[in-house]
Structure formats: C-alpha cells, structure tokens
A protein has these predicted regions:
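N-terminal glycine-rich phosphate-binding loop for ADP-containing cofactors
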Residues: 1-358
Length: 358
C-alpha cells in the first residue's frame, strides 16, 4: 500500500464528527468501517450519514427515486466493526473521532499500534489535544498524524493536517493527497496547542470579552463592528452558536498548552456563564436570549445596556484584529505553519474576510 491511497477507511467514534467523516469517505467511493463502543451510537451515526447523504443528493437536483438510489448506493459502502482490532486489521487509513479525552484516545492508539497494518496511516481528529501524546503510545509514531476536520465535516472545506516531529514525510504526503481528493482544502501545521484556527482565532473572542469586562464596549456594538467588517457573525454570536462551554474548554486547552500566557487568559465572564448553565443557543440563553427556533431574540438582561461603551466600532475592530494579527505572526515566526496556510485556515475555518498578514 506504500505510496497509494488506502481503499478502506476506518472511523472510530460514531458521533457527529465520526459520522460526518464517514459520510465524506463513502461519498468519495471508499469502503468505510465504523466502530463505536455504543451500539446505539452506531445506529444514530448511520442515521446521520443517511440524512446527510439525502441532503447532498437533494442539492444535486435528483428526483425522489434517484435520491433513494444514490443514497442507498453509497450507504452500501458503510459497515460497522465490532472491535477496534477488527477495524484496524483492514483499514489503510484509520481516523479516530472519539471524545476529547486524552486517556481514552491513548487507549485507542495503543490498540491501533498493535492491530493496524504496518503501513496504515493512523490519524486523530482531535481539535485540541497533543498529537504527539497519541503517537508515542502507538509505538509507530512515524505513521501518526492529526486530521482535524471542522464541523459539519461534509460541508466545511478545511482540514488541518497536523504533523509531529516523528511523522514520516511520506506518510504526511499520503494523508494530504487522500484528503485533498475528498474535495477538502488541506493546510499543514506542526503539533502545537490549538493548531492554527483554534489558536490564531482565539483572540477574536478573548479580546471581545476583555472589552466587555472593562465596560469599554457592549455585546451589540462589538458584534455589529465585526459583522460590518465582513465576518459572518460577531464574537458573542459565535460563542452562543458554538456553545460557551465548548469555547471555554478550547480557550483553556490553548492557554494551558502554551504555558498560560496572559494574552490568552480565559475570561471570568465565560466561567460564570458556564457555572450558571448559560451555554448559549443550546441552553436558551448566553450572551443572547434564544427563541424556540434557536435564533437570538435579544441581548441577555445582564448584558443589555443603553450605553454602547467608550470604544467605537472602528476601535473595536482594530483591537480584535490587532490581537489576531499578533497571534498569527507568532505562529508563522515560530515555524508552526506558513503565512499562506494560516490565512487559508482562518478564511475557511473561521470566516475571516482577509488574511491577517494583509
């Protein structure tokens, strides 16, 4: 299999990300094997794949009968495996998409190190954990990479290819060629906290929270300023959409991993909201109040104010984008990723309207 794309793809974890990755693989003609310790999760995962394929077929303009045939034809490529060992024994590419728990992922990679074919590519979809910490326990670190898909995987074009110091260049090249063949845009980065997007985009929310903490600008002014600059949504709208708890967990992981620099210190406002169960759209309230359809109906009472603050929209943009640019320069100057890959990653992964290096 050396130098060739694997024909069989294994996906470990049948949650939202695992199912999405499996859908992408079968859409591109790969026989795909799915494993999850929870049999019910497998069934839910298959249902997600079917729904995703049906949406995709609908966008292709197929009629109802043709949609069913198209979906069924691709679903025939998807099957489940009872164990990790069974999956690993036949897959040329294994993508681990289990929960973001280092101990769990290390257990999986220990098993893969024993059971996978000698030339198999072993990948993790982690968004925050150390790829090297998984590679070392596998016993075959040269064949381990990160393949960080963005949610929803069938829709988002970006994949971060994360290489460790031990990753063999030929393995990284094979992984990149395969994922590019799935109509994804692949950017490379070294194994470091947050990779590209989750690190460089971090000041987008942190700097906004700092201004809110200091009473310098309101939630509405900050969000309006960034939308006016070409972003699809402002920092507070984004945190409510993603989940304030999810955003806080990522902020903590990057902050801890980089040695707790003050510039990336998580905000006490987020800590308080998470402690109160105010997680954004999924809980009904966060920085905004959300209706039954999930759409914001107004700013939450404790953030609503007739005073928009002393910092105008232009200064809000300068503060936030200045912090993003500074982080982008740090990543580029450290040799973790190229300027071009950083710019592409921010555009496709976080909706940035322009390069931070412009």
């Amino acid at each position: 299999m050396h130098g060739r794309a694997p024909s069989i793809v294994g996906v470990i974890g049948a949650g939202t990300m695992g199912a999405g990755i499996a859908q992408v693989a079968i859409e591109h003609g790969h026989e795909t094997v799915l494993h999850d310790v929870d049999a019910a999760a497998i069934e839910r995962g298959r249902a997600r794949v079917r729904e995703g394929l049906a949406r995709r077929a609908g966008r292709l303009g197929l009629d109802a009968d043709s949609i069913d045939d198209w979906v069924d034809g691709r679903l025939a490529l998807l099957r489940d495996a009872p164990t990790i060992d069974a999956l690993a024994a036949e897959a040329g590419l294994v993508i681990e998409a289990a929960a973001e728990d280092l101990g769990l992922k290390q257990t999986i990679f220990r098993s893969l190190g024993v059971a996978a074919a000698p030339d198999a590519i072993l990948a993790t979809n982690t968004s925050a954990l150390s790829v090297a910490a998984l590679a070392v326990v596998s016993g075959r670190a040269g064949h381990v990479v990160g393949l960080h898909f963005f949610n929803p995987a069938p829709v988002m074009a970006l994949v971060e290819l994360v290489v460790t110091e031990a990753t063999l260049p030929a393995v990284a090249d094979r992984a990149e060629a395969l994922i590019a063949g799935w109509d994804k845009t692949v950017v490379r980065c070294a194994d470091s906290p947050g990779f590209i997007v989750n690190r460089v985009h971090r000041p987008f929310t942190i700097e906004a929270l700092r201004m809110l903490e200091a009473g310098e600008a309101s939630v509405e002014r900050i969000d309006a300023a960034m939308r006016a600059d070409g972003f699809p949504m402002g920092p507070f709208e984004l945190m409510d959409l993603v989940g304030i708890d999810v955003n806080l967990a990522a902020a903590r992981a990057v902050w801890d991993g980089l040695g707790r620099p003050d510039r990336l210190r998580p905000s006490p406002i987020q800590e308080r909201l998470v402690a109160d169960g105010r997680l954004g759209r999924k809980s009904g309230t966060g920085f905004y109040v959300h209706g039954s359809d999930g759409r914001p109906t107004g700013v939450s009472a404790d953030f609503a104010t007739p005073d928009p603050g002393t910092v105008d929209e232009a200064a809000v943009r300068d503060r936030i984008l200045g912090a993003v640019r500074a982080e982008a320069r740090l990543v580029a100057e450290s040799g973790l990723a190229t300027e071009d890959d950083i710019a592409i990653a921010l555009r496709l992964g976080a909706g940035h309207p322009r390069s931070p290096f412009d």
